[in-house]
Amino acid sequence: MANEYKKILLLKGLELMDEYHFIIIKSLLAYDLGLTTKMQEEYNRIKISDLMEKKFQGVACVDKLIELAKDMPPLKNLVNNLRKERSKVARKMKAQGVVLMKKINQEEVGLVAPAPTARNTLTSEVGERIPVAQKRKTLSKGKTEAKRIKVPQEQSEPPHPSGASTSAATDHPPLPHTSSSTPSNTSFAQNQQTQAQCQVDTRRNVPQKDPVTVMVLKATAPFKYESPEHGKSTMFHATVASKTQYFHVKVFDISLKEKFIRKKVITISDYSECKGVMEIKEASSVSDFDQNFEVPNRIIEIANKTPKISQLYKQASGTMVYGLFMVQKKSIHKKNTIYEIKDNTGSMDVVGNGKWHNIKCEKGDKLRLFCFQLRTVNRKLKLVCGSHSFIKVIKAKKNKEGSMNVN
């Protein structure tokens, strides 16, 4: 799909520009692409697209051209067309991903064996190589036995939007999405690990068609990240709230940054939900909402509330965490840094690597964490950073919040 984005860049972007605006684009790209004055004069559209593809991999090359061209009024139609073409490719990639996942599920689970749920866990476990006649008998027996299995309430409830994604800590309504029951009998967990993983993969990103109107509470500065599907790209985090609940948001379309201004009311559609967090991508739509819209103070207070560390220890591994925590200790290692955070209920380690390795902070400072994940490391629950994680540091002495410059 990377080639699809390059086709958009070259055929729908650079090739449709007049010479004057192409010269401007080359000048603006000179620093990023390392262009000398001579190169700017000699390089044509094909050469520039080759360099942009290497520097800004995947969709990032189209994003970069949009970013540069959107401030040029004569290129307004070209920019709109680039966004449409980018969305088409994004939808195509999403559709191919669904087809591929279905194929994987069929290969792993088998076309005959049903997906493991609370009702058919027993049959899917033993039905892999049983003759048809015997399988029917086993299925009947399995259904009878499965009725005795009770699904715990916490497993049947949909995940909450993460405030640290913890209902106990924040007491908020869930992010609307489709959920399915999970097997409750732990004795079958090991045997069905492959099937369960397939189910998790297909559920990890759930499209949401219904639009939602929200007020922007806060947003981070854009930052660079790297992922297998997009390579190096840019995103930012935001927190928004409707009249009944709040959402942590990952925004992967940087052109939407101007929409995420504090107290601005917007309508979001065609977004998706992953692990309780709203995701806005190229195919999503964000528009202004001009009517009167008020968010109850209680919702805003809950959205801004940091979960207690004692509550984090009660959450499952994999829970997404957001919040403001005080640094108690900083331990620098060769490959990562351990930031010990503390409140009046306990302490926990935050593992920072990559861009979050050895950031400038000390005891007494506060770390505002975005999109950190609870993980069990050496039999101890810790907060671990991922590719989408972000940290803001609030210095204790100056009491002034600022994001780390890590690029």
Curated annotation (Swiss-Prot):
- Chief location bin: nucleus
Question: Sorted alphabetically, which keywords does the UniProt record give?
Answer: Activator, Cytoplasm, DNA-binding, Nucleus, Repressor, Transcription, Transcription regulation
**Which GO molecular-function terms appear in the entry?**
double-stranded DNA binding
Q: Give the GO cellular component terms, alphabetically.
A: cytosol; nucleolus; nucleoplasm
Task: Tell me the ranges covered by the HIN-200 domain, including all copies.
Answer: 196-394
Please identify the protein, giving its name as recorded: Myeloid cell nuclear differentiation antigen
> What are the BP-aspect GO terms?
activation of innate immune response; cellular response to interferon-beta
- Organism domain of life: Eukaryota
Q: Which PANTHER family match?
A: INTERFERON-INDUCIBLE PROTEIN AIM2 FAMILY MEMBER, MYELOID CELL NUCLEAR DIFFERENTIATION ANTIGEN
Domain Pyrin: residue ranges: 1-88
**Described purpose of this protein according to its UniProt entry:** May act as a transcriptional activator/repressor in the myeloid lineage. Plays a role in the granulocyte/monocyte cell-specific response to interferon. Stimulates the DNA binding of the transcriptional repressor protein YY1.
Quaternary assembly: Participates in a ternary complex with YY1 and the YY1 target DNA element. Binds nucleolin and nucleophosmin/NPM/B23.
Short sequence motif Nuclear localization signal: positions = 131-137
Q: Where does this polypeptide localize?
A: Nucleus; Cytoplasm
Gene name in the database record: MNDA
| Region (Disordered) residue spans | 122-211
Instruction: Return the Gene3D superfamilies for the record.
Output: Death Domain, Fas, Nucleic acid-binding proteins
Q: Fetch the Pfam families from UniProt.
A: HIN (PF02760), PYRIN (PF02758)
The domain-related comment in the record is:
Its N-terminal half (200 amino acids) is sufficient for maximum enhancement of YY1 DNA binding and a portion of this sequence is responsible for binding YY1.
Provide ranges: composition bias, Low complexity: 177-199
Respond yes or no to whether keyword Transcription regulation is given for this record. yes
